[in-house]
Amino acid sequence: MGASLLLPLRRRPWTCRTCLLQARRSLETAASPATHRAAFDYLPSKNDAQKKSDDDTLRRVFDSQPFWREFSQRSAAHLKPTGLVQNQYLTSPDGFRVFATTTLQKCQAIVAKVLAGTTLEDYQSMARDLDRLSDLLCRVIDLSDFIRVIHPDPRVQEAATQAYALMFEYMNVLNTTTGLNDQLKKAAANPEVTARWSDEEKIVAQILIKDFSNSAIHMPPHARQRFVNLSNDISQLGNTFVNAAEPAKSHVTVSANSLRGLDPILVQQIKRWNRTASVPSMGLIPRLALRSVHDEGVRREVYLATRTSSARQIQRLEQLLAKRAELAQLSGYDSFAHMTLSDKMAKSPEAVSNFLTSLVGSNRPYVQEELAQLQSMKGSAGRLQPWDHAYYVHQRVLQYSQSRRSRELSAVPEFFSLGTVMQGLSRLFDRLYGVRLVPQETAAGETWNSDVRRLDVVDEADRHIAVIYCDLFSRPNKHPNPAHYTLRCAREISAEEVAECATTMDASAHPNDGMATAVDRDAKTLRQLPTIALVCDFPEPPATGTGRPSLLSEHSVRTLFHEMGHALHSILGQTRLQSISGTRCATDFAELPSVLMERFATAPEVLALYARHWETDAPLSESMMQHMEKDRTAHGSIYGAMENESQILMALVDQAYHSLPAGQATSIDSTAVFHQVSAEHCTLPDPTDTKPPTSWQGFFGHLHGYGATYYSYIFDRAIANKLWEDVFQQGKAAVDRQAGERYKNEVLRWGGGRNGWNCVAGVLGSAHPANADGRLVEGGDEAMREVGRWGLGRDGVSE
């Protein structure tokens, strides 16, 4: 499938891709649409009693199964059955077909309107019309994509898959509709039109024009067909590269006696009849062997095997790189990196390289400090080698755990029941941003599994502003990876859309398909509320209500805070147009809210809000908080900087591969490039004299999904560290409303409607030394270098 209109419009991060007839009168009177179940109306609490009750309920719905059963069954008597996530169509598998075809008809009407536009009024509405087209496409695609993965019923999975496919087929039609691009360009070039556009409309128009350009819609037919063919080849090659990664040799044969240090049970699993053992080159066993086998020669063999890809895997990668370079050349760019980065904060591969090399410099002293400690452990046995690193790191961690790690730390999870952590998130959001999480009963048919909890997000005036479905407990066949999904984006629903529903023959027609809406009383407009799903894989609490609830490790707590950071961006980034709402921002800015949220998870000021013993309700003691901090610092000092260097190296390799012009990319030697980058920037590089040479790049699956943008996570991490240090004062202002409002107003509320550099400069302030002479606002090479100088710090989290 070739490049398409939808994929850019969805603008989803790594991945991972947000009233009825009386509504029109509601807009005129600013009265609440009380006749509809789509959005719950909250009575103002007037005092703290309701808030306290909601807070207590939030903890209990996650920690007590009997309480949850009682809570979830209350709705049976007074709530009418509904569809999945309140979508009025999705009451049965066939509803996906009706949902998709009905939405398709709405899309076709918008396309016809745009193509027929001739008047000034027609062109003035064009940015908003195409934004609505994007919203309609994403309504089906995003929700169907999620349901086909998460729903336990195969019939629903199949129906969702078909709805998904139908909309993709329609996108192929849009890809050939050159008139959409032509009309939007006419509108954007007319000063009389743009003078009446809002800032959001101007931004969305430019985004869509760029997206059209990237999909080759402006090219002559033969070039466009070549573009589509290349896109198809890239997709297929990329998927194969990710899913068929393989080593040059499947295993390493060694003497079983030489595996001393490895768990004897594992040795028995791989032992052969002739006293040898076959160590696989992929999976958990080789990783454990590198950590624990005492024999350096064995570690060397295993290490080299795990770092050497098969020849056909390298061939796949090099074909992928060559086709991407050709695609960029066809589109008028010097390289794939130039094409990909043109609308990112970085703007160019040169700027990314400046950031990464600056980061190497700020990280290098910490790396040397860590390696010096490991070298002293190896002593006279020789110079530290790359296959030694995991082994001596493990030895240092064991030494630390045996000598200085506090026994109190083993009890820390008892203060992190899932309910208390969710309670803590709500309390933190209330302190910083004036919003909180309220457990809400669900109607029959609303959730895809009986253990899914619904939380409504309300503000200080008790106005409903978002919906979060929490699917946090493990179950058979559920994907274990934590994730955030935007099922419906925030946007303003126009009066015309409400009127359209009011005049339809279908009395149940709803401008948001029955999903959550709310009236903005100040603007007298109807809003489509963001609907979000959070998915994790935590153990379920006991059914009887006796015994421990689901207790989280520190790592799991940080993971939950990370995913909720994405949700927070969707909740507070409520723009008028959906193409720039919430997380729909530049790829290299999208991880900032989630990475920053991790810092709050274990800050003492935040722990004091929620960390309480699941049984006694005793708060986490100050001494335990101090031990947690010491433990993180100790682990970070053992391996944090080397982990940073590894991430930086991968980002540098990604840039080196994707910055090559088409002429050079067709004959690329990816292994030589990998070793060249390693020799220049890696403190402990792979040897270059092995035959065959190591070719770790064949296992770097993110080269497909994040081609030319792998730097994004560490870029956002550097920014997050700076904001934590200077805005939230290294945690001292972690629950300070003034700091929270500053961050919300300068970063979160904009979604993707403001240049990321303006957000960073705004939240740091014009007087900040890093923003001297407006260097951050301007972005570019110097701003990227400045962020590189901020560094990544060292952060180790014990399991």
From Swiss-Prot:
<dbReference type="GO" id="GO:0046872">
    <property type="term" value="F:metal ion binding"/>
</dbReference>
<feature type="binding site">
    <location>
        <position position="569"/>
    </location>
    <ligand>
        <name>Zn(2+)</name>
    </ligand>
</feature>
<feature type="binding site">
    <location>
        <position position="566"/>
    </location>
    <ligand>
        <name>Zn(2+)</name>
    </ligand>
</feature>
<keyword id="KW-0496">Mitochondrion</keyword>
<dbReference type="InterPro" id="IPR033851">
    <property type="entry name" value="M3A_MIP"/>
</dbReference>
<dbReference type="Pfam" id="PF01432">
    <property type="entry name" value="Peptidase_M3"/>
</dbReference>
<keyword id="KW-0378">Hydrolase</keyword>
<dbReference type="GO" id="GO:0004222">
    <property type="term" value="F:metalloendopeptidase activity"/>
</dbReference>
<dbReference type="InterPro" id="IPR024077">
    <property type="entry name" value="Neurolysin/TOP_dom2"/>
</dbReference>
<dbReference type="GO" id="GO:0006518">
    <property type="term" value="P:peptide metabolic process"/>
</dbReference>
<keyword id="KW-0482">Metalloprotease</keyword>
<keyword id="KW-0862">Zinc</keyword>
<dbReference type="InterPro" id="IPR024079">
    <property type="entry name" value="MetalloPept_cat_dom_sf"/>
</dbReference>
<keyword id="KW-0809">Transit peptide</keyword>
<dbReference type="GO" id="GO:0006627">
    <property type="term" value="P:protein processing involved in protein targeting to mitochondrion"/>
</dbReference>
<keyword id="KW-0645">Protease</keyword>
<feature type="binding site">
    <location>
        <position position="562"/>
    </location>
    <ligand>
        <name>Zn(2+)</name>
    </ligand>
</feature>
<comment type="function">
    <text>Cleaves proteins, imported into the mitochondrion, to their mature size. While most mitochondrial precursor proteins are processed to the mature form in one step by mitochondrial processing peptidase (MPP), the sequential cleavage by MIP of an octapeptide after initial processing by MPP is a required step for a subgroup of nuclear-encoded precursor proteins destined for the matrix or the inner membrane.</text>
</comment>
<keyword id="KW-0479">Metal-binding</keyword>
<protein>
    <recommendedName>
        <fullName>Mitochondrial intermediate peptidase</fullName>
        <ecNumber>3.4.24.59</ecNumber>
    </recommendedName>
</protein>
<dbReference type="GO" id="GO:0005759">
    <property type="term" value="C:mitochondrial matrix"/>
</dbReference>
<comment type="similarity">
    <text>Belongs to the peptidase M3 family.</text>
</comment>
<feature type="active site">
    <location>
        <position position="563"/>
    </location>
</feature>
<dbReference type="InterPro" id="IPR045090">
    <property type="entry name" value="Pept_M3A_M3B"/>
</dbReference>
<dbReference type="InterPro" id="IPR001567">
    <property type="entry name" value="Pept_M3A_M3B_dom"/>
</dbReference>
